[in-house]
Amino acid sequence: MSTPAYLTKLESIPKEKFLFGPSPISYLPNLTAVLGGKVKLYAKREDCNSGLAYGGNKVRKLEYLVADAKAKGCNTLVSVGGVQSNHTRAVTAVAVASGLKAVTVQEKWVPIDPPLYSETGNILLSRLMGGDVRLNQETFDIRHKKATEDAFKDVEAKGGKPYYIPAGASDHPLGGLGFTNWVVELAKQEKELGVFFDVVIVCSVTGSSHAGTVVGAVAEGRKRKIIGIDASGKPEATRNQVLKIARNTAALLDERLEIKEEDVILDDRFHAGIYGIPDDETIAAMKLAAQTDAFITDPVYEGKSMAGMIRLVKEGAIKEGSNVLYIHLGGQPALNAYSSYFPHA
């Protein structure tokens, strides 16, 4: 059997090697039992995918972007995120590992200021790695930002050659490739495990993890359902961005690959109304996962997608007998900045 065109193209695109290998898949037996046992719950652990500063989904995506940056002779990665951004921590990590510099604009995406919020967690790790961290008062938005443009020009003015990486490594020509390849990786693991995951749950904000997974699922043609859980609080913008990235990624890999609007499923019931702030359902979901399978999530992303998965199972929205795969995108370092939400947890 010949290799599909999209796979041939995907394998031809240069990338760095920042991951240990395939991210592990673990069964969640206790959470499965607590939720009734009618569907089996598993997790694919992007939080365990790399040795670079706690890894995470962004490291997988950045394998392609850093290869592109190096091919273009760039010496400084310039990007943006919130104060507790997993992405900017990952950008700094891959820069250090690649002998590059990193300039990260850390905006006030979350309208709270708990004690030490801008001193602990992800931003502490970025500073520890020697990143050029620049605090900024701009609020949350997944669009391209002027502050990042200013940082880019500043690097140029000082004689550097910057490479721009948008928030989440998402709205970039190569942003969806990491998670398209994730589906290819998953299919190989399924063959080894003797299981097929009917439903995949993924958190969605800047959109490329969700979009890449959709492209991979459509391309393989195995009727796998990808459910995005919005954590942006701006679901219309997120849905549009996921569809845009998915279509651009598909076009890059195979012009015959069609992504339809209905391929992008985004459940908008669990974002708590705003990016970066957990509600009672988020916190309850985090505690349940932690107290059943010692499965640690964060209050910004994974806590909200965990809340989504738990409610979908409880509602019976997932067909009995299904194997559900939750993508753990990482992000636990941010938990250190949210201790005020967990008094004597």
Curated annotation (Swiss-Prot):
<dbReference type="InterPro" id="IPR005965">
    <property type="entry name" value="ACP_carboxylate_deaminase"/>
</dbReference>
<dbReference type="GO" id="GO:0009310">
    <property type="term" value="P:amine catabolic process"/>
</dbReference>
<dbReference type="InterPro" id="IPR001926">
    <property type="entry name" value="TrpB-like_PALP"/>
</dbReference>
<feature type="active site" description="Nucleophile">
    <location>
        <position position="85"/>
    </location>
</feature>
<dbReference type="GO" id="GO:0019148">
    <property type="term" value="F:D-cysteine desulfhydrase activity"/>
</dbReference>
<dbReference type="InterPro" id="IPR036052">
    <property type="entry name" value="TrpB-like_PALP_sf"/>
</dbReference>
<dbReference type="GO" id="GO:0030170">
    <property type="term" value="F:pyridoxal phosphate binding"/>
</dbReference>
<feature type="modified residue" description="N6-(pyridoxal phosphate)lysine">
    <location>
        <position position="58"/>
    </location>
</feature>
<comment type="function">
    <text>Catalyzes a cyclopropane ring-opening reaction, the irreversible conversion of 1-aminocyclopropane-1-carboxylate (ACC) to ammonia and alpha-ketobutyrate.</text>
</comment>
<comment type="similarity">
    <text>Belongs to the ACC deaminase/D-cysteine desulfhydrase family.</text>
</comment>
<keyword id="KW-0663">Pyridoxal phosphate</keyword>
<dbReference type="Pfam" id="PF00291">
    <property type="entry name" value="PALP"/>
</dbReference>
<dbReference type="InterPro" id="IPR027278">
    <property type="entry name" value="ACCD_DCysDesulf"/>
</dbReference>
<dbReference type="GO" id="GO:0008660">
    <property type="term" value="F:1-aminocyclopropane-1-carboxylate deaminase activity"/>
</dbReference>
<keyword id="KW-0378">Hydrolase</keyword>
<protein>
    <recommendedName>
        <fullName>Probable 1-aminocyclopropane-1-carboxylate deaminase</fullName>
        <ecNumber>3.5.99.7</ecNumber>
    </recommendedName>
</protein>
